[in-house]
């Protein structure tokens, strides 16, 4: 019942490096700092209002340093969405790692997803910006979740934990449910506890 559980089979994306991928640990840290600054800047100002100078100012680096790692604003948005997606999937995979069955994984995954979104509200804001800059960026984010999720439901089917059926349809339905629960209860109004939401859906 959750976007969260999609995570397990997802693999870490290799950083694509614009003009130059980081070759040292220091370079990797600088690149990560620029990405984090872009997350804050796009989430606050929006993609079109934000400039490279806003990102570099937030990151505390020179504009020349930005172009060492990224060709421009669209590329850093693409890399940011990719990086954020990996972080979410890795976080949720860890949360459901020791679950005993599909239902428990769904419950823990949904709770973890809602909590993650509550703590990282810029995730949805950046995604919405990406949708109107380059739909492929937006689509890739969800398809990466979906592929891993389908594999997990297929595994649960083989174990007899869920009935055979079209797992791709199930996955997109569950992802949609989690997406809107996140909007309503983790971003817009936090007036229902996440435990209550999970219990309601599991009833």
Name what the model sees in each region.
Residues 26, 30-38, 55, 76, ...:
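Generic hydrophobic, amphipathic alpha-helix propensity
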């Amino acid at each position: 019942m959750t976007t969260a559980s999609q995570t397990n089979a997802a693999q870490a994306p290799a950083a694509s490096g614009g003009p130059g991928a980081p070759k040292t640990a220091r370079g990797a840290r600088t690149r990560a700092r620029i990405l984090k600054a872009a997350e804050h800047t796009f989430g606050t100002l929006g993609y079109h209002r934000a400039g490279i100078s806003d990102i570099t100012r937030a990151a505390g680096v020179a504009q020349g340093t930005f172009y060492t790692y990224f060709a421009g604003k669209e590329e850093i948005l693409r890399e940011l969405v990719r990086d954020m997606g990996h972080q979410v999937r890795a976080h949720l995979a860890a949360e459901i790692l020791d679950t005993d069955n599909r239902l428990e994984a769904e419950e823990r995954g949904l709770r973890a997803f809602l909590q993650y979104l509550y703590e990282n509200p810029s995730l949805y804001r950046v995604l919405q910006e990406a949708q109107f800059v380059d739909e492929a960026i937006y689509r890739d984010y969800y398809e990466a979740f979906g592929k891993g999720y389908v594999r997990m439901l297929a595994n649960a089917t083989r174990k007899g934990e869920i009935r055979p059926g079209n797992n791709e349809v199930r996955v997109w339905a569950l992802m949609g449910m989690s997406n809107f629960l996140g909007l309503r209860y983790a971003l817009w109004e936090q007036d229902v506890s996440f435990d209550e939401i999970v219990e309601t859906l599991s009833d």
